[in-house]
A protein has these predicted regions:
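Transmembrane alpha-helix interface/packing and boundary motifs in multi-pass membrane proteins
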Residues: 1-9, 40-46, 150-154, 202-206, ...
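Hydrophobic alpha-helical transmembrane segments of multi-pass integral membrane proteins
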Residues: 1-22, 224-268, 272, 279-280
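Core transmembrane alpha-helical segments of multi-pass membrane transporters/permeases
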Residues: 2, 159-160, 167, 171-174, ...
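Membrane-core helix-loop-helix motifs of multi-pass transport proteins
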Residues: 23-111, 271, 281, 294-332, ...
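Membrane-interfacial loop-to-helix junctions in multi-pass transporters
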Residues: 25-35, 135-138, 188-195, 220-238, ...
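Small-residue-rich segments of transmembrane alpha-helices in multi-pass membrane proteins
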Residues: 43-49, 109-111, 190-204, 259, ...
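Long, contiguous bundles of hydrophobic transmembrane helices that form the permeation core
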Residues: 71, 75-183, 301, 336-341
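Helical membrane-embedded segments and adjacent short helical loop/helix-boundary regions
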Residues: 131-139, 156-160, 185-201, 229, ...
Length: 341
């Protein structure tokens, strides 16, 4: 789930993870809620990449570079990944104690990934064999690794790096010009939706700023924040991002609430990029929100109740968020106390 989530699409992660792991869980009589919980947490952490939704929204809303937000977040994501792996190990031990020693019939290992009584709604992924490039596996892996290293090192602006890597990958894998057109046309919808989001965000934030609403709302917010709590606004933003992104959409939080908090925080010496990093801490909890469509796909494919998934996963998602908050403060991604003057 951690590797698949690098594409920034939770739906893809859930389809692949559930299709491959649910039959094994059912065969071993394991709790499917642990699978949905771990898949969701992995998606929540890895979705902090610059091409993921939350980081792009925060960067657009506060007019900062996505690379300035993401690169310092890499160590925090590493700590969160370790926490998720430790949690997976602990949940596995708990399942072992619950189930004890299982006796499987002879030859069961040959069919471990097949469940005759499993759900019928698992996705059937049809792949056009003509589009596959197994001989170029290591070439594509090397190109992806080079792109990731360049992103972390900040060699060039993020859009330039992605355009260069995309052009190289397209030429290597599909040298025929007609096939290149078909590949671009097939995936153009995903690109256009993101571009539309950025334009809409720019219009929305422009209206808020140009009419003076952001300034007025920030002054109102400053008025209700006790002077003693103002310097802690970055940490407060990180904490309130858990319930805020649960009860409202990412668009509402990042384009409506975050600019106001950021404007108020500047009075305490906290920069917009630091506020953007703080606002991303609550993303693992956000994926439990009933406003997230991909979560319905996850519980539907796994055959579990949405409420059961929320009750089971909330404490673990909160724990991962708190680990990320502690790591972010330890690595200095945003200050615990603002720098006044």
């Amino acid at each position: 789930a951690l590797v698949i989530s690098l594409d920034g699409d939770g739906s893809t992660t859930y389809m692949i993870v559930v299709a491959s792991m649910l039959p094994l869980y059912r065969r071993l009589k394991m709790n499917a809620l642990s699978m949905t919980c771990l898949a969701m947490l992995a998606s929540g952490v890895m979705n902090l990449t610059p091409w993921g939704g939350p980081t792009a929204r925060a960067a657009s809303a506060l007019h900062v570079d996505a690379g300035d937000i993401f690169v310092p977040l890499v160590p925090v994501m590493g700590v969160a990944i370790v926490a998720i792996l430790i949690l997976a190990f602990c949940l596995g031990l708990r399942e072992r104690r619950r189930l004890g020693v299982l006796s499987l019939p002879d030859g069961a290992s040959l069919h471990a990934g097949y469940d005759e009584d499993g759900p019928k709604n698992l996705p059937e992924i049809e792949v056009d064999q003509d589009l596959r490039r197994p001989k170029l596996l290591w070439v594509n892996a090397g190109l992806t690794l080079a792109l990731m290293v360049s992103l972390v090192m900040g060699v060039l602006p993020l859009p330039v790096l992605f355009m260069i890597a995309f052009a190289i990958a397209l030429v290597i894998n599909y040298p025929d010009l007609a096939e290149q057109r078909r590949r671009v046309a097939q995936h153009a919808g995903n690109v256009l939706s993101v571009v539309s989001l950025i334009f809409a965000a720019g219009i929305f934030t422009g209206i808020l700023s140009g009419t003076g609403m952001v300034e007025a709302m920030s002054r109102s917010l400053l008025a209700v924040i006790p002077d003693a709590m103002g310097p802690y606004l970055a940490g407060i933003t990180a904490l309130v991002s858990l319930p805020f992104t649960f009860f409202m959409s990412n668009d509402a939080f990042y384009f409506g609430v975050l600019p106001i908090l950021s404007e108020a925080a500047q009075g305490y010496g906290i920069s917009p990029v630091e506020m953007a990093r703080a606002s991303l801490i609550g993303q693992p909890v956000h994926l439990l929100s009933p406003l997230v469509p991909s979560t319905y796909l996850l519980v539907g494919l796994a055959g579990v109740d949405f409420g059961d998934h929320q009750r089971y996963s909330l404490k673990w998602a909160t724990m991962v968020c708190l680990v990320m908050l502690a790591a972010a403060l330890a690595f200095g991604l945003f200050p615990l106390v603002g720098r006044i003057g």
